[in-house]
Amino acid sequence: MAKAIPKKGSRGRISSRKSIRKIPKGVIHIQASFNNTIVTVTDVRGRVVSWSSAGTCGFQGTRRGTPFAAQTAAANAIRAVVDQGMQRAEVMIKGPGLGRDAALRAIRRSGILLTFVRDVTPMPHNGCRPPKKRRV
């Protein structure tokens, strides 16, 4: 019977595998739909540092689309990167949801200096036909 070959470096790790990087500047993406708000913090190259959404903060159902849920999600996403030394950030807001302003307010309150805020909501130049209106 073949013996199991021990893996190199499997005898207990002294430090964590992922080294904590110092990130002085980053990009905060806010995606606000009517049902949920997702906040993603990346470095300047686009690598995700931390993220949070209203769903991961414990809100369920229609409460995920509320401004308070968006505020909580933004605060959770930013708490991790402030510990890594982020001081300046750019903000990209996408979507028509209620959480746009609340998430931006939470970011401003966190103490990170915002270099600019840009609305990157995709707008059609009369592209596809929209779905038919609901009849209630």
UniProtKB/Swiss-Prot annotation:
Any Pfam family hit: Ribosomal_S11
Keyword Transmembrane attributed: no
GO cellular component, one term: chloroplast
One GO MF term attached to the UniProt entry: rRNA binding
Ranges annotated as spanning the membrane: none
Keywords in alphabetical order: Chloroplast, Plastid, Ribonucleoprotein, Ribosomal protein, RNA-binding, rRNA-binding
Entry's Gene Ontology BP terms: translation
Protein name, UniProt field: Small ribosomal subunit protein uS11c
Major site of localization recorded for this protein: plastid
Organism lineage: Eukaryota, Viridiplantae, Streptophyta, Embryophyta, Tracheophyta
Gene expressing this chain: rps11
Quaternary context: Part of the 30S ribosomal subunit.
